[in-house]
Amino acid sequence: MIYDALIAPFTEFEFMRRALAAVIALSLGGAPIGVFLMLRRMSLVGDAMAHAILPGAAIGFLLSGLNLFAMTAGGLIAGFAVAILAGVVARTTELKEDASLATFYLVSLALGVTIVSIKGTNIDLLHVLFGNILAMDDQTLLVIAFNATITLIVLAVIFRPLVIECVDPVFLRTVSRAGAPAHLAFLALVVINLVNGFHALGTLLAVGLMILPAGIARFWSRDITGMICIAVASAGVSGYAGLVLSFQTRVPSGPAIILVAAALYVFSVLFGNVSGLVRQMFPGRHLEA
């Protein structure tokens, strides 16, 4: 019974194995980025940039249909363009960067939906907005795995300045010039992983496997390395459980994955050993034995 419910879907169906491999790749690449977004108080920036890739992906769709490379290139170009434009607006006007990103996010979402609607059907629009990880083909899986690998390599190179910048950015500027290049590389990784998530979960849910696991990890560890490990594990568990839930109940796979992650987040808020609500209400219970 347990085998049929939890394991058989992946041994019997190739599309489930592809989806699971994609979830693992997204977890390895996206969850560490989510931890740094949270530590740098940029979680909403990640959400805004997730929606900002929509017009580029929509233009790729308009020109080539549901073509992997056209939509990937369009999403990357749009994501980088919005990040750069938001920074320019924030530095040359009185509008702060979060407000300028929010403006571009709203415009991008409206523009992207309009572009997709010009050529596509409601089914195409739903595919772009919410993705379909169960329809993953080998090419898309390879792109996701490649981007995750690049993310881990670059993150290993810029890990030290990123950590220092999270703790003391003034000190980093004093002792090193690596702060600005590391920040730019980090923004590039954010865009790359949002495009990765877009292929599997769509633009509206792409940021989910980045931010929710990071939030979960924050309630279980104070150490950055520990938070990254917990975030990756919780993202993987959410993906696996969400796929099983989707397969057994026929609910959409993307929302199922995010809802499982949300359930883990609520559990962590209540019972996490770092500032969880239950621990705050009963601070001495852990000393009893």
Q: Which role fits each region the language model picked out?
A:
Residues 1-28:
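Membrane-interfacial amphipathic/re-entrant helices at transmembrane-helix boundaries
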Residues 3-10, 93, 100-160:
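Transmembrane helix-bundle core of multi-pass membrane transporters
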Residues 20-25, 72-77, 99-103, 141-146, ...:
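Hydrophobic alpha-helical transmembrane segments
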Residues 35-50, 54-122, 217-229, 246-248, ...:
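Short loop segments and helix-boundary regions at transmembrane helix junctions
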Residues 52-60, 103-115, 135-136, 179-189, ...:
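Small-residue-rich segments of transmembrane alpha-helices in multi-pass membrane proteins
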Residues 141-213:
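Helix-loop-helix "hairpin" substructures at the membrane interface of multi-pass membrane proteins
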Residues 204-255:
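Transmembrane alpha-helical segments in multi-pass inner-membrane proteins
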Residues 251-289:
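Cytosolic-side transmembrane-helix boundaries in multi-pass membrane proteins
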